[in-house]
Design a protein with these regions (language model features):
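Coupling and communication elements adjacent to P-loop NTPase active sites across diverse families
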Residues: 9-36, 123-241
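ABC ATP-binding cassette signature C-motif
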Residues: 1-135, 225-413
Length: 413
């Protein structure tokens, strides 16, 4: 409540309580010190305060990074009731649920289009396809005109040379020099006209393809295990101290499965992953883990990344050339390789962890919220990778658009 009074001293308390109720925040949470709230609760409180301010056009920057799937749906429903804001988000479902225009920062320009993300994406794909077809058409026409211009120039030059070699005294009754010269001039004029048309088409072609985002293919190197069953949990309960986090967890991970581990924040998802990885998590129940199973892990936390890219890979047992190549395909410039990773955006740091995992040969890939802060283009790039190579994957992720495309099974905690 103290942050509400600090940021909105002139606003009435009942209005604040109305807004937080729409965001599914219990009233007792409102009266707790702000610093003791979870990241998701803090985000909701700040959103409620933002919309108390009248006559403002609000800027909302990535509000979902610390929210679970259910909380994201609540945020989407809440924002759908509001007007007068710009939302920056990489969550496609959230964008679809609450916006009526898309402001797209393209490679060459900025454009605004009526609709949501899905309609914008469809229009973008159609525009890209149209430009690529037009580009190919122009390329063929330019090649044809080049050949035609060269042919006319060649004949013009040949006629001009033949004119200069003529012996007028021996050519009475045949084409005279004037006729041949005129013919050569016509060919040259035609050649220059064709050249002019060609240059116009080249100029037209140069205006195409500037806003096309080429999603380069990246690869993963999953290993085949000799047995189909890799992991099994049977009636497993997890504890934090003496407090039970979750209970009666039952699932089997078989080779080829892509499993979404789903649950509210604090439901024990990360603890399940860490237990499989062999960390000291208190539990009861039966757990089977195949012997000699190779696991590649992408963690949530990026705060331990330090030094530059070359410092980072020196301590890793991975193909350095492959790692750098993947980063380049994920939109890293070569200049960034020399910079301190601590200065990178959170999305760039997460890409480093994902690129590391993609370089590791493993039977099972475990990814804990891999897409936090990752841009939409890279999310689609990773989706395509997983669908193409079908690694065995256990992951926690709150981006439902990604999860719905990638997951073959869902485990709910």
């Amino acid at each position: 409540m103290e942050i509400f009074k600090e940021m909105c001293p002139d606003s009435e308390e009942w209005k604040f309580l109305r807004e937080v109720s729409l965001l599914d925040i219990k009233e007792d949470i409102v009266y707790r010190p702000y610093k003791f709230l979870s990241n998701g609760e803090q985000t909701k409180i700040l959103l409620a305060i933002l919309f108390l301010k009248e006559n403002n056009f609000l800027l909302i920057d990535e509000p979902t990074n610390h929210l679970d799937i259910n909380a994201r749906k609540i945020i989407g429903k809440y924002l759908n009731r509001k007007n007068g804001f710009i939302l920056v988000s990489h969550d496609r479902n959230l964008i679809d649920s609450c916006v009526n225009h898309i402001l797209s920062i393209n490679r060459r320009n900025i454009e605004i289009q009526k609709g949501n993300f899905s309609s914008w994406e469809k229009n973008k794909q159609q525009q890209d396809e149209l430009e690529m077809l037009q580009n190919e058409k122009l390329k063929k026409e330019i090649t044809r005109l080049e050949k035609s211009a060269r042919k006319n120039a060649f004949w013009s030059e040949k006629l001009e040379k033949s004119k200069n070699r003529l012996d007028v005294s021996k050519t009475v009754g045949f084409a005279d020099k004037g006729f041949i010269g005129a013919q050569a001039a016509r060919n040259m004029k035609r050649s220059k006209s064709i050249e002019k048309r060609k240059n116009k088409l080249i100029e037209e072609k140069s205006e195409l393809l500037h806003n096309i985002d080429i999603n380069e293919r990246i690869k993963i190197h999953p290993l085949q295990f000799h047995n189909s069953r890799l992991i099994e949990f049977e009636n497993v309960s997890l504890f934090y101290g003496n407090n039970k986090i979750c209970e009666n967890i039952n699932f089997v991970i078989k080779q080829g499965d892509r499993i979404l581990l789903k649950g509210k924040n604090g439901s024990g998802k990360s603890s399940v992953l860490k237990l499989i990885l062999g960390e000291n998590i208190k539990y009861c129940g039966y757990i089977y883990k195949a012997k000699n199973l190779k696991i590649s892990y992408v963690q949530q936390n990026t705060s331990n990344l330090t030094g530059n890219i070359f410092d980072y890979i020196n301590g890793k047992q991975i193909d350095k050339t492959l790692f750098l190549s993947i980063l380049r395909k994920m939109d890293f410039s070569r200049l960034q390789f020399e910079k301190d990773i601590a200065s990178f955006s959170e999305g760039q740091k997460k890409k480093i962890l994902i690129a590391t995992s993609l370089c590791e040969e493993a039977h099972l890939y475990i990814w804990d919220e891999p897409l936090n802060f990752i841009d939409i283009l890279s999310r689609i790039q990773i989706e395509n990778l997983i669908l193409e190579y079908s690694p065995t994957l256990l992951f926690v992720e709150h981006d439902m658009a990604f999860s719905e495309k990638v997951a073959t099974k869902i485990i709910c905690l």
